[in-house]
Structure formats: C-alpha cells, structure tokens
C-alpha cells in the first residue's frame, strides 16, 4: 500500500463576490488529488482536497516541497501501526520535514489541502465515511448529526437588500435555521440596514450571525458591537486580524 502520486491544479474562483477583505474575482484555489495503489470496488482510491476559498492556490509550494517529501518517503513510514491504512499524522510529519516550526502564511494552506486529501483517501481505504472513521479511532459512537449553518451575504456589484433577502430566504427554504452574512465591507450604517433587512426576512424562526472577516481595528470593532447589541444575533465573528494581539486581548 502506497501513495503513488499527488496531483494539484490551481483554478480561478472567478466570482464577483467579496467580503470585507477579499475580492474573489482575483482569487484562486488549489484542488489536490492523493492517488494510492489501493483498489476498492474496482476503482483506484483517490483522496481529494482543496484549500480555503479565502486563500490563494498553493500549487508552487505543493510541487516544490510537500509532494516530493511524501512520494520519496518509504511507504511503510507513512502507514498506521496496524499496517492496513495510511496514517495522516505520519504523512503530515513527512511534509513538515526540514520546515521551521511555527509560522503564519502560505505553507499552512498548501499542507492543509494535501492533508484534507489524505484523510479522504484514508476513509475510502477503510470503507467508511470519515466522520465514522474518526469516531472509531477514538473509541466513540459517531453522531450522525452535526450543527451546520449557511454562510453567505457577500457583497457583489448591484446586490441590493431585496437580493440579500432572497438569498437568505433560499437558505431557509433548504432547511437551514442559522444563516451568516458578511459585514465590514460597507459603512456601518449600510451594514446596519442590511442586517435589519435580513432579520426582517428570516423572522423569529431562524438565527443570524455576522462575520467581519478580520477587517476591523479596535475602535471600529467596538462601534459595530454597540450597534449590533440591539439585535438578537447568534454571533459576531472575526472582528480583527488574528495576529493583532493587542486587539484580541482588549
């Protein structure tokens, strides 16, 4: 049992939407396939992964560093203790060979896309959905239900409040009872108007969360918090840069 190839393709997201920071018309994403020599149900097992749509594709790092470290490692060094499957933790260690600990940047995006594909391949080799495999690994009963919400409410050219309301209504029609919208990409007054429009649309049968995508400084974050506290919001997310420690401590 071994990994025989790791393939990556970088594709444009090419969407006119934006949040408080990111213009997705300029954004790319990496799609990764981890190819194994294992065959299940007559098909070769391939695990798939992709990076966050808020980060650029990382094909360069994947091909220059991380792909070869996995392919050049001995197959046995990448397997679990039972020898019947690949081990994501050992593969992660192989990827991080000769890498300095710590760091905040593109490396984590490249490693994460491969890591996702590795876990997908591992579950397919085991013949189980990943959530059940993870529970089995911890000796726990898998919960078939998980909390989910619909994230949307992006900004895009020509999107007015009626379009925003229709978008949020579409999530409710699909069974979601928690929705999230972007803030911080417009003025406080405009965002307040947008929030009120969504709350009016979803009524008391659903809940609304808001996400600033790390846009605010402390003063702006507090100004928004004072505005938001009058509304029954589920949460107020990511107010500032995660590396702005003074803001996070305030």
What are the roles of these predicted feature ranges?
Residues 167-182:
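Catalytic domains of carbohydrate-active enzymes, especially glycoside hydrolases
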Residues 32, 44, 114, 127, ...:
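Conserved, mostly hydrophobic/aromatic
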